[in-house]
């Protein structure tokens, strides 16, 4: 027994944990305990490379395990100490190989290549979900989705407004004139064909009128030819004017009923006279009225679009004011009410002047509450009991030696416009009130 005792100059000092812990019971039967690989990871991991131990080396002094290459490199390039507990390691002679631990690892993980493949998959999945690049990609995808949805929303609103007001465009394509009694029904004449008919009729009437004028000026022609030309022109003009006038007026009424509301509905033009000289004016008036109605429908559609956009952007004014407009403030104690003998000033000492930069839509009440909270946090126990309840009055000095008390619901934007029109930090004063 004496041979097993440690040498007198080499004593093993037990730690508090080793002194207090109870020994674990030895398993003597065939009981198996299921242990997850994650719980074993910290035991089988090298503290230097954070990977599974390879060619395990154990320190003789503190019994910490490392990979052979890792600990040799650490001793060669760093301090001569254990990377885990900083105990002194002189050289490689302070290490010993641990083949039993390598055998244990090989029993748990027979194939190291399979283990490394699993670890690579886990790290790849982790990088996809948790890395900085994944965050950037997620933000970019969100911006793309927002940019795609925004034009679709505006196009839908524009199409809904244009469908009601665009009666003179595609809406007039399927408008049919009411049939006369005993006459066949006309279907599928659009607005461009109607304008083409009006232009053709006006050109025919102009050519007939010009031919009549030339024959009247030419004395060499016989009276019979002139009379026949006049008769043919007069016969053609009433028929064409009557047909075109009836179809135009009926079509205009249908288009007006379909496109214009009752308040802006235009009345149909009267049927022109049989004279051929008024025919071009009739065509021009029809075109002018159509253009004016198109402009009215476009203006109505623009009004709808503007209304929709106003509804979408409603409530953004205050946000833009609070973000874009910032005001710098210099808070000073009131020169008379917050004199040197004031309890709060004695507690504040050199912290009585405050420099603040805030948004323009902040109110005077916000500043008062900020001062109360800030001074309470800064002073803490130094704040006298009489000053525990902090109520402040806020003043502004538009002129030297002139202090104006401010209302609590006034915003800094209003105060700046009314009292302070100088491009420098606004000077404000505060006084402590007991009530």
Swiss-Prot record:
Phosphoserine found at? 202, 266, 269
Q: In which pathway does it act?
A: Protein modification; protein ubiquitination
Q: What tissue specificity does the UniProt entry give? A: Ubiquitously expressed in syncytial blastoderm embryos. Ubiquitously expressed until stage 11. Then, it is only expressed in the neuroectoderm. Later in embryonic development, it is only expressed in the CNS. In larvae, it is expressed in all imaginal disks. Expressed in the male and female gonads.
Q: What is its EC number?
A: 2.3.2.27
Cellular component terms, GO, for this chain's entry?
chromatin; nuclear envelope; nucleolus; nucleus; PcG protein complex; PRC1 complex; ubiquitin ligase complex
GO terms for biological process, alphabetical: anterior/posterior axis specification; follicle cell of egg chamber stalk formation; germarium-derived female germ-line cyst encapsulation; heterochromatin formation; meiotic cell cycle; neurogenesis; protein ubiquitination; regulation of transcription by RNA polymerase II
Could you tell me the keywords of this UniProt record?
Cell cycle, Chromosome, Meiosis, Metal-binding, Nucleus, Phosphoprotein, Repressor, Transcription, Transcription regulation, Transferase, Ubl conjugation pathway, Zinc, Zinc-finger
* Renumbered zinc finger spans (RING-type): 46-86
Q: Where is this region: Disordered?
A: 144-322
Q: Where is the composition biased (Acidic residues)?
A: 309-322
InterPro entries, per database record: RAWUL, RING1/RING2, RING1_RING-HC, Znf_RING, Znf_RING/FYVE/PHD, Znf_RING_CS
Q: Which residues carry this modification: Phosphothreonine?
A: 267
Location of the protein in the cell? Nucleus; Chromosome
Bias (Gly residues) ranges: 157-170
What reactions does this protein catalyze? S-ubiquitinyl-[E2 ubiquitin-conjugating enzyme]-L-cysteine + [acceptor protein]-L-lysine = [E2 ubiquitin-conjugating enzyme]-L-cysteine + N(6)-ubiquitinyl-[acceptor protein]-L-lysine
Keyword Coiled coil listed? The answer is no
* Role description: E3 ubiquitin-protein ligase that mediates monoubiquitination of 'Lys-118' of histone H2A, thereby playing a central role in histone code and gene regulation. H2A 'Lys-118' ubiquitination gives a specific tag for epigenetic transcriptional repression. Polycomb group (PcG) protein. PcG proteins act by forming multiprotein complexes, which are required to maintain the transcriptionally repressive state of homeotic genes throughout development. PcG proteins are not required to initiate repression, but to maintain it during later stages of development.
- State the name under which the record lists this protein: E3 ubiquitin-protein ligase RING1
Q: Which organism is it from?
A: Drosophila melanogaster
Its gene name is Sce
């Amino acid at each position: 027994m004496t041979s097993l005792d440690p040498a007198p100059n080499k004593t093993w000092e037990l730690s508090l944990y080793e002194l207090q812990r109870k020994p674990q019971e030895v398993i003597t039967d065939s009981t198996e305990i299921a242990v997850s690989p994650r719980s074993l990871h910290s035991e089988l991991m090298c503290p230097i490379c954070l990977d599974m131990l390879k060619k395990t080396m154990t320190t003789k002094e503190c019994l910490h395990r490392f990979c052979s290459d890792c600990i040799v490199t650490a001793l060669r390039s760093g301090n001569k100490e254990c990377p885990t507990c900083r105990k002194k390691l002189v050289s490689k002679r302070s290490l010993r190989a641990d083949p039993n631990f390598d055998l244990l690892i090989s029993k748990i993980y027979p194939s190291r290549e399979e283990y490394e493949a699993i670890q690579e998959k886990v790290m790849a999945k982790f990088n996809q979900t948790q890395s900085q690049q994944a965050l950037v990609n997620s933000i970019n995808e969100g911006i793309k989705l927002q940019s795609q949805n925004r034009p679709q929303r505006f196009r839908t609103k524009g199409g809904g407004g244009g469908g009601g007001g665009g009666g003179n465009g595609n809406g007039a394509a399927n408008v049919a004139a009411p049939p006369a009694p005993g006459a066949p029904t006309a279907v599928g004449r659009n607005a461009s064909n109607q304008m083409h008919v009006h232009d053709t009729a006006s050109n025919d009437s102009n050519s007939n009128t010009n031919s009549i004028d030339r024959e009247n000026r030419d004395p060499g022609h016989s009276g019979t030819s002139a009379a026949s030309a006049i008769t043919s022109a007069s016969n053609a003009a009433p028929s064409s004017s009557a047909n075109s006038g009836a179809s135009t007026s009926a079509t205009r009424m249908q288009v007006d009923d379909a496109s214009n509301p009752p308040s802006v509905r235009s009345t149909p033009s009267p049927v022109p006279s049989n004279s051929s000289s008024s025919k071009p004016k009739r065509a021009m008036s029809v075109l002018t009225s159509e253009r004016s109605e198109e402009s009215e429908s476009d203006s109505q559609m623009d009004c709808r679009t503007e209304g929709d956009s106003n509804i979408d952007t409603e409530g953004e004014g205050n946000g833009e004011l609070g973000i874009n407009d910032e005001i710098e403030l210099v808070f000073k104690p009131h020169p008379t009410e917050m004199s040197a003998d004031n309890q709060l000033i004695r507690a504040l000492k050199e912290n009585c002047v405050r420099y603040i930069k805030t948004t323009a839509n902040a109110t005077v009440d916000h500043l008062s509450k900020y001062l109360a909270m800030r001074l309470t946090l800064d002073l803490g126990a130094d704040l006298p009991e009489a000053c525990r309840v902090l109520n402040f009055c806020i003043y502004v000095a538009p002129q030297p030696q002139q202090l104006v008390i401010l209302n609590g619901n006034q915003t800094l934007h209003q105060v700046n416009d009314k009292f302070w029109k100088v491009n420098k930090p606004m000077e404000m004063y505060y006084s402590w009130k007991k009530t």
